[in-house]
A protein has these predicted regions:
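Residues at the C-termini of beta-strands that transition into short coil/loop
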Residues: 8, 61, 193
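A short loop-to-beta-strand scaffold at the N-terminal edge of the catalytic core in hydrolase folds
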Residues: 1-6
C-alpha cells in the first residue's frame, strides 16, 4: 500500500514524498523523525503550526521497490521518468495528490550517488538542493524563484552544521521527471538529495540535515525569512559534480616489469553487492577517496593487462615487507 499522512489544517499546503526510488531511504527515516518532533512541539517554536500549515506526507511512494531495494517499481518502471505518461500506479497517485491538493510547496526527497561532491573543494555533497525548471530555457517563474529563495534560507542554516557540504543540484530539464513536471503545473518545488558524509556510510548526517531543512523551510514560510534572498544568492551555491569521490584511491604505484617503468594512481569503487571495480588509472589527483593509500614501495603481482577501467579489481600486491595484499584487504585496513 501507499500510505498518505496529513498533519495540520492550516492554509499553507505542503506536500512531501520520499522513496520514489525504492533504494533511497534516507529521507524516509528523516520524515519519521520530523513527524515525531513536530508532534512533540518541544524542540522548535512551532506551537501554532497546526493552524498555519497542512502537511501531506507520503513517506514511501515506491513500496515494491523498497521491499526489493531497487530503484524501479514492481513493473520495473522508474517512477521518476513516468510523469508524462503515468503508467505506474505510484505515479498516478502522486499526480492525483498534486492535482487535488494544489500545494504551495512540494518537497521531492531522494538519495544521490555516494560519489557526488563539490569539486573545487573536494568535499562530499551531503545535501544537494534544486529549484527544478519547467522548460528547456530554464525560465525563472515566480514559483521557481520562491523555491530558490527557500533553498537559500535552508542552506544558510545547514552551513552552520556541515560547512562545505551543501550543494546545488544540476538543473538540466527532464520533462519526464516529476519535479520538473510539477513546477510546470505552477507548484513551487524543491528537490532535496541526500548524500554521504565522511565516515558516515549509512547517511545519518544527511538524515539529520533533512530534518533540519524541513523545519527551516517551515520557519522561513511562517516568518517570511526567505524573501530577501536573490536569484544570484541561489546560483552562488556551489553546484555538485559527478565522480568527485571514489571508495578507494591508491597512489604512487610503480609499474616496473616493463621496458619503460611508470607510476600510476588507481581508483576503485565498491558496488552494492560488495564487488570491487576499477574506475580510473593514471593521474587521479582531482579525485578524492573515502580511503586513500600510498602504494609507494609496493609491487603489482597481477598481470598489468588485467588492470583496466571498468573491470573487476582482482588485484594482488606485494608490500615492502613481502606480504601479499588484496584490494579487499586494503579496503579493510
Amino acid at each position: 500500500p501507499i500510505l498518505h499522512l496529513r498533519m495540520g489544517a492550516g492554509p499553507v499546503k505542503i506536500l512531501m514524498w520520499s522513496q520514489m526510488h525504492g533504494d533511497e531511504s534516507t529521507a524516509t527515516a528523516a520524515l519519521m523523525d520530523f513527524i515525531h518532533l513536530l508532534c512533540r512541539q518541544t524542540e522548535y517554536n512551532f506551537n501554532d503550526w497546526q493552524t498555519r500549515f497542512t502537511i501531506d506526507i507520503v513517506p514511501m511512494l515506491n513500496a515494491d521497490g523498497a521491499a526489493k531495494q531497487t530503484r524501479v517499481n514492481g513493473q520495473f518502471i522508474d517512477i521518476n521518468r513516468d510523469a508524462l505518461v503515468l503508467q505506474s500506479p505510484e505515479g498516478r497517485v502522486l499526480q492525483h495528490l498534486v492535482s487535488s491538493l494544489q500545494p504551495d510547496l512540494a518537497l521531492n526527497l531522494h538519495d544521490q550517488n555516494a560519489y557526488h561532491g563539490i569539486s573545487e573543494r573536494q568535499h562530499t555533497s551531503t545535501i544537494a538542493m534544486l529549484a527544478p525548471v519547467a522548460d528547456h530555457a530554464k525560465h525563472i517563474t515566480p514559483v521557481r524563484k520562491q523555491a530558490m529563495q527557500l533553498i537559500c534560507a535552508a542552506q544558510k542554516v545547514l552551513r552552520e552544521y556541515i560547512p562545505n557540504h551543501v550543494a546545488r543540484f544540476d538543473d538540466t530539464f527532464s520533462p519526464r521527471s516529476f519535479g520538473d513536471n510539477i513546477v510546470s503545473q505552477g507548484v513551487s518545488t524543491i528537490l532535496i538529495e541526500s548524500g554521504t558524509f565522511i565516515n558516515d556510510p549509512h547517511r545519518q548526517v544527511a538524515r539529520k540535515m533533512n530534518v533540519l531543512t524541513y523545519f527551516t523551510l517551515l520557519d522561513a514560510l511562517l516568518h517570511n525569512k526567505y524573501e530577501h534572498y536573490t536569484i544570484e544568492d541561489y546560483f552562488a551555491i556551489p553546484e555538485h559534480q559527478d565522480d568527485v569521490y571514489v571508495d578507494l584511491k591508491l597512489t604512487d604505484l610503480l609499474i616496473a616489469n616493463t621496458d619503460h617503468p611508470f607510476t600510476i594512481d588507481i581508483t576503485i569503487n565498491v558496488d552494492k553487492h560488495g564487488s570491487t571495480n576499477i574506475e580510473h588509472i593514471g593521474d587521479c589527483h582531482t579525485v578524492k577517496g573515502f580511503k586513500e593509500l600510498s602504494l609507494s614501495g609496493y609491487q603489482l603481482i597481477s598481470d598489468y593487462q588485467d588492470l583496466q577501467p571498468d573491470s573487476a579489481a582482482n588485484l594482488i600486491f606485494v608490500s615492502p615487507s613481502g606480504l601479499l595484499i588484496t584490494i579487499n584487504e586494503l579496503l579493510s585496513t
